[in-house]
Amino acid sequence: MAVDEALMESGRTGRVTLRLYGWEPGCLSFGRNQTARGRYDGGRAAKRGIDVVRRPTGGRSVFHYRELTYSMTAPADEWGGLADAYLRINRALASGLRELGVPASVVDVKRDGPTPRPTVRACFRDPLPGEVVAGGRKLIGSAQWRDGGALLQHGSILLHNDQRTVEDLRVGLSEAVDVPAVGLAEYVDPLPSLERLSQALMESFGGELEREPACEALTMKERTAAGKARAKYEDDAWTWRR
């Protein structure tokens, strides 16, 4: 999360970047304004070896395990307003996955529909307008944050559906709850290598967004900014602030 925030700072200078990464160990992440205190059991997560973090972006809970996280940063006006940029980025993601044989599509957008509130429910339980699905089930969960002339959109591309863990870590849930999401493994066997997946996404971003993002090592300035931001994301006062 600290690195994503640091890359967002570079977006203020006009830089467009794409970062792809995984999590070790598995991690439960909360949306920026999601109520988590009293709703999720941090002790239970720790006993299972699961980290917990709060994202700088909005949205709902995601379990990061056997998935690939993407992070896109850019100037805030690069692709229009929040809704337009969100839709264009998600269309690029879907296009890249289709090149790998995944029947990915974007849920139709109803601009007059209500804005979803950050509830305790798992992000992957409900495909929302503008999100990437396959076979009617949610494949990618994304969220966007804008600040100081830059945007950060990141999200989880499921390789396998392990999102039931989100519900397993809820407080007071007496029965197991399935999360009807879908992972790439249900459509592609064997799974593409990280290099092949990265290549497909880079090419689709370059085509759909008309500007190929940088996908390279952090600059010294970005490393310094990430180091400063790291303390916030390791602090329980941020993670469990609400």
Regions found by a protein language model. Name each.
Residues 67-129:
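Internal, conserved structured core segments that host functional sites
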Residues 39-80:
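A glycine-rich, hydrophobic loop/mini-helix early in the fold
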Residues 1-56, 207, 211:
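N-terminal low-complexity, intrinsically disordered segments
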Residues 33, 60-61, 143:
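Gly/Ser/Thr-rich beta-alpha loop segments that engage phosphate groups in nucleotides
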Residues 34, 75-77, 137, 161-164:
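Short loop segments at secondary-structure junctions
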Residues 93-118, 146-242:
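Long, positively charged amphipathic alpha-helical accessory segments at protein N-termini or as interdomain linkers
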Residues 125-143:
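Aromatic/basic-lined ligand-recognition segments
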Residues 4, 8, 28, 45, ...:
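Histidine/cysteine-enriched polar flanking segments
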